[in-house]
C-alpha cells in the first residue's frame, strides 16, 4: 500500500502513534488539518507488524514503510548494508547505555540501533516535523516509545543529560552547503572550534557542524560512527575536522567508499565512514578504500596509519588510497608548470559581453573560455577564438582611451553600477571595481569540475579564461611539440581518481592537485 499524499502519510503516522501528547508544536501543526486515516484497522496492524519485523525479504533493503517519501533537504537515505556494517562496528566497541542519532529522518539508524542494543536508551534528533512523525510511528510500532526520546530541533541546540554508561553517536548527518547556513551558526562553528585551539573556516557544510556538536556533547569513552560525503578529507575547510578527529574526537577508523558503491543513492559521490572513541589520541587510525558493498565486512579491516602521518598530511585521500607507484623517471606536472585558476569576474552576467556591451571598444572585449564546454568541444586543440564569448576587461586607468571611447565606457559603467556590479565582494576588493584583470593567456587550459576527467587543451588562439578553467603556465620555455605531446598524454592517462568527488558526482581538481599529477619525464614523453 502506498501513501499518495502527505496528509495520508500523516494520518497513518497518527494511527500508529499511541502517545500523541508528546508531539512537538511543529508536529501538531502538521496534524491539525489531517483527517482520520482511511486505512482499516487490519491494514494498520499489518503495517505495524511489518515495521516491527525490521527487514523485507531482501537482505539488502531495510523495511522502512514510512521512510520512502522524498527526504528533507540535505538528507539521503543510507543503504541497509552500510547501516548494518556500522552497527556491527558499534557492537564491537561495547554495550552503549545511550544511542544518539543526530539527523534521524524516519529512523533508519536509530531503529537498527534499537534492534542491536535492546537495553540502550534511544535519542533521535530530527528538525523536519514530517520525518519526526514517521520516526515516532516507527518507534511506536516496535513498542519502543518508553525507551526513546525524539527531539524535533536543530542538533546544534541539543543538550543531553548525564549518562552513567557509554553514549554512542551514529548516523548520516545531513549535507547542507555553507551557502545555506546562517552567519550566526558560522560564528558558532568558528567560536567552538577556537575553544579547542583549532581555526575553522566558514565554508564548512552542516555535516561538519554535526561532528563539532558531537564533540561538545560527548565525554571520554563515548564512541561513534558517521557517514558523510568525503570532501572534508582534502579541502581546506576540512582541516578543522581532520584535527578534531585526531586530537579531540578520537578518530580510530576511516573507511572511504567509491562513488560506485552508492552510499548516497542517486548522488554518485565519494563517502567516508569516520569511526571514533572520544579520548583516544595514541592508537593508529585504521583506513581503507572500499569499492564494493560486499567488502564492508563490519568495518573491521584496513591498514593502520600512525596518527602522526595523518597529522602531517594536507590531504587524507592520498593516504587512504595511495597513488599508483611512480615509474622510474616520472615527475610531477608542477615541476614544469604553474597552475592557476581563471579570474573571477564577480558578475558574469555583466562582465561577459552581450548586447549590453555592444558600444564598448573591441579592444576591451577579450576572447575567453567561459564554459567548460568550450574546452570539451575543442578537444586537444583550441585553434580559433571565433566560437568563444568575450569578457570585458577594462584597465584600472581609463586615460588612454579617446574621448568617444571614454563616453561609451562611462555609459556602460553607469549601467553596470545600476545593476550592482560595483557591490560584489570581488569588485570591492579590486584596485578598480570595473577592472576584471584577466590573466595572460595560458599555453594549456584544462577543465577542473565535471563528471569526467579533466579536458586538457592547447590554447593555440591565446584565449583568456575565467574561473571555470585552470591555466597551465610553463616555468621555463617549452617547445610546442613537447606541450602537444603532454596534452595528448594527459588526456589519455588522467582519470577522476586523482581529484575529489563531491555530492552530485562532480569531480574537482584544485590547481595544486593538477600540479601533483605524475607525468613521464620530458625525455620519455617525447621519445
Curated annotation (Swiss-Prot):
GO terms for biological process: DNA restriction-modification system; methylation. Keywords: DNA-binding, Methyltransferase, Restriction system, S-adenosyl-L-methionine, Transferase. This is Type II methyltransferase M.XamI. It catalyses: a 2'-deoxyadenosine in DNA + S-adenosyl-L-methionine = an N(6)-methyl-2'-deoxyadenosine in DNA + S-adenosyl-L-homocysteine + H(+). Belongs to the N(4)/N(6)-methyltransferase family. It comes from Xanthomonas campestris pv. amaranthicola. SUPFAM superfamilies: S-adenosyl-L-methionine-dependent methyltransferases. One of its GO terms (molecular function) is site-specific DNA-methyltransferase (adenine-specific) activity. Its EC number is 2.1.1.72.
Amino acid at each position: 500500500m502506498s501513501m499518495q499524499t502527505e496528509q495520508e502519510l500523516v494520518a497513518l503516522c497518527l494511527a500508529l502513534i499511541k502517545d500523541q501528547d508528546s508531539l512537538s508544536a511543529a508536529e501538531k501543526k502538521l496534524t491539525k488539518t489531517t483527517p482520520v486515516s482511511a486505512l482499516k484497522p487490519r491494514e494498520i496492524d499489518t503495517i505495524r507488524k511489518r515495521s516491527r519485523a525490521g527487514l523485507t525479504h531482501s537482505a539488502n533493503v531495510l523495511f522502512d514503510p514510512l521512510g520512502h517519501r522524498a527526504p528533507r533537504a540535505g538528507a539521503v537515505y543510507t543503504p541497509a548494508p552500510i547501516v548494518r556494517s556500522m552497527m556491527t562496528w558499534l557492537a564491537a566497541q561495547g554495550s552503549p547505555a545511550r544511542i544518539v542519532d543526530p539527523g534521524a529522518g524516519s529512523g533508519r539508524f536509530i531503529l537498527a540501533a534499537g534492534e542491536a542494543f535492546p537495553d540502550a536508551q534511544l535519542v533521535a534528533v530530527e528538525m523536519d516535523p514530517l520525518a519526526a512523525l514517521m520516526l515516532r510511528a516507527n518507534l511506536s510500532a516496535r513498542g519502543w516509545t518508553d525507551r526513546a526520546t525524539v527531539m524535533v530541533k536543530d542538533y546544534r541546540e541539543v543538550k543531553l543529560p548525564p549518562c552513567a554508561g557509554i553514549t554512542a553517536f551514529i548516523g548520516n548527518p545531513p549535507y547542507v552547503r555553507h551557502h545555506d547556513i546562517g552567519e550566526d551558526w558560522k560564528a558558532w562553528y568558528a567560536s567552538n572550534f577556537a575553544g579547542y585551539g583549532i581555526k575553522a573556516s566558514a565554508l564548512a557544510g552542516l555535516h561538519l557542524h554535526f561532528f563539532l556538536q558531537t564533540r561538545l556533547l560527548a565525554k571520554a569513552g563515548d564512541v561513534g560512527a558517521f557517514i558523510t560525503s568525503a570532501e572534508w578529507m582534502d579541502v581546506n575547510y576540512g582541516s578543522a575536522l581532520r584535527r578534531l578527529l585526531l586530537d579531540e574526537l578520537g578518530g580510530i577508523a576511516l573507511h572511504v567508499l567509491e562513488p560506485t558503491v552508492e552510499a548516497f543513492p542517486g548522488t554518485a559521490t565519494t563517502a567516508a565512514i569516520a569511526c571514533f572513541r572520544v579520548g583516544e589520541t595514541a592508537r593508529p587510525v585504521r583506513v581503507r578504500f572500499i569499492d564494493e558493498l560486499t567488502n564492508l565486512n563490519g568495518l573491521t579491516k584496513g591498514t593502520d596509519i600512525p596518527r602522526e602521518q595523518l597529522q602531517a598530511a594536507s590531504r587524507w585521500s592520498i593516504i587512504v588510497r595511495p597513488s599508483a607507484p611512480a615509474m622510474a623517471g616520472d615527475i610531477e606536472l608542477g615541476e614544469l608548470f604553474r597552475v592557476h585558476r581563471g579570474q573571477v569576474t564577480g558578475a558574469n552576467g555583466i562582465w561577459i559581453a552581450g548586447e549590453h556591451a555592444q558600444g564598448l571598444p573591441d579592444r576591451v572585449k577579450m576572447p575567453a573560455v567561459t564554459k567548460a564546454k568550450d574546452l570539451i568541444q575543442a578537444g586537444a586543440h583550441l585553434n580559433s577564438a571565433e566560437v568563444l564569448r568575450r569578457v570585458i576587461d577594462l584597465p584600472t586607468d581609463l586615460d588612454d582611451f579617446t574621448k568617444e571611447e571614454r563616453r561609451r565606457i562611462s555609459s556602460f559603467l553607469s549601467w553596470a553600477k545600476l545593476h550592482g556590479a560595483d557591490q560584489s565582494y570581488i569588485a570591492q576588493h579590486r584596485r578598480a571595481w570595473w577592472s576584471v584583470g584577466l590573466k595572460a593567456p595560458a599555453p594549456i587550459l584544462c577543465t577542473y569540475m565535471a563528471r569526467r576527467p579533466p579536458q586538457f587543451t592547447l590554447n593555440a588562439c591565446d584565449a583568456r579564461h575565467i574561473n571555470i578553467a585552470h591555466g597551465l603556465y610553463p616555468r621555463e620555455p617549452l617547445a610546442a611539440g613537447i606541450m602537444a605531446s603532454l596534452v595528448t598524454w594527459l588526456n589519455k592517462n588522467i582519470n577522476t581518481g586523482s581529484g575529489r568527488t563531491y555530492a552530485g558526482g562532480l569531480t574537482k581538481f584544485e590547481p595544486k592537485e593538477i600540479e601533483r599529477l605524475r607525468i613521464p619525464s620530458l625525455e620519455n614523453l617525447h621519445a
